[in-house]
């Protein structure tokens, strides 16, 4: 659906509390749509505005807490921002639309070719000593991290992991 919206190869932000829908949004972007830009949920509106502009985000998945600020930023025509996608209700609609596209024979997302050297994750440093900086990661960086950890840990379907860190700042 994101590809159908014209977001193939574009930068798409994700902001919100740690939750299942955050991960679904993240993976739907990074696994064949474009570049994911995880955003710090604790940023004040002016810093959020700055990151949206600097990263050239065209769409953002968000939770209800950020709706008012993001609508204001969208109305102000900040950067390239065009779409706001709520994790509260629109995500289910997007999934249904995606299923319809697949039934109609659209396999653009399923058959997406991923360039493992191309940047598809854009992180921002916390900016504790100065303005936050962009860290560009490729799909290869991501997969290498997973392969390394799986060679150390014996993970199976019975395992449970607890994360208390903000999800935008870590990959677990």
Model-derived regions: residue spans:
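Structural core segment of the AMP-binding/adenylate-forming
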Residues: 4-5, 31-97
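Short aromatic/basic micro-patch
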Residues: 61, 113, 136
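Conserved S/T- and glycine-rich ATP-binding loop of Class I adenylate-forming
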Residues: 12, 29, 60, 119, ...
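Conserved AMP-binding loop of ANL adenylate-forming enzymes
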Residues: 14, 152-172
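Conserved AMP-binding/adenylate-forming
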Residues: 1-43
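Conserved pre-ATP/AMP-binding loop-to-beta segment of ANL
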Residues: 86-89, 102-124, 131, 154-160
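Conserved AMP-binding A3 loop
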Residues: 120-146
